[in-house]
């Protein structure tokens, strides 16, 4: 049970740090406008699934952001190692967060119902 709280705490710290690293350390223009929305940790803290959103809705921008994040993984892990007091920095997997787009789509559908 205590392990669950640790994974949540480590996930929150990684989320905060990765957002800061993307803003201050990564200079790749493909990751500009990327925001980390959530981090899901594996129970043993070996893998972190990092969910992100991007301001643009264009498919090409989403693809470029994914490639940019994958290229910046080494830099991000190195900075995490400097900033976090963990025995082993988890492997990072970046996944586009579809929940915000899904929520916007439902909101639009509800607004259309109100108009009819």
Swiss-Prot record:
Q: Give the organism's phylogenetic lineage.
A: Bacteria, Bacillati, Bacillota, Bacilli, Lactobacillales
Q: By what name is this protein known?
A: Ribosome-binding factor A
| Entry keywords, A to Z | Cytoplasm, Ribosome biogenesis
Q: Does the keyword Transferase apply?
A: no
| Keyword set includes Cytoplasm | yes
Q: How does it assemble?
A: Monomer. Binds 30S ribosomal subunits, but not 50S ribosomal subunits or 70S ribosomes.
Identify the gene encoding this protein: rbfA
Report the source organism.
Streptococcus pneumoniae serotype 19F (strain G54)
Name the major location. cytoplasm
The entry assigns this protein to a family as follows: Belongs to the RbfA family.
**Gene Ontology cellular-component terms listed:** cytosol
One annotated GO molecular function is: ribosomal small subunit binding
What is known about what this protein does?
Answer: One of several proteins that assist in the late maturation steps of the functional core of the 30S ribosomal subunit. Associates with free 30S ribosomal subunits (but not with 30S subunits that are part of 70S ribosomes or polysomes). Required for efficient processing of 16S rRNA. May interact with the 5'-terminal helix region of 16S rRNA.
Q: InterPro entries from the xrefs?
A: KH_dom-like_a/b, RbfA, RbfA_dom_sf, Ribosome-bd_factorA_CS
User: Could you tell me where this protein is found in the cell?
Assistant: Cytoplasm
Provide the GO biological process annotations. Answer: maturation of SSU-rRNA
């Amino acid at each position: 049970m205590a392990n669950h709280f640790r994974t949540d705490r480590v996930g929150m710290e990684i989320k905060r740090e990765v957002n800061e690293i993307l803003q201050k350390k990564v200079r790749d223009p493909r990751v500009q406008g990327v925001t980390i929305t959530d981090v899901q940790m594996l129970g043993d803290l070996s893998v972190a699934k990092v969910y992100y959103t991007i301001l643009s809705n264009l498919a090409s921008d989403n693809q470029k952001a994914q490639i940019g994040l994958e290229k910046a993984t080494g830099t991000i892990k190195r900075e995490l190692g400097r900033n976090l007091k963990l025995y082993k920095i988890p492997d990072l997997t970046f996944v586009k967060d579809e929940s915000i787009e899904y929520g916007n789509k439902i909101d639009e559908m509800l607004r259309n119902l109100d108009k009819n």
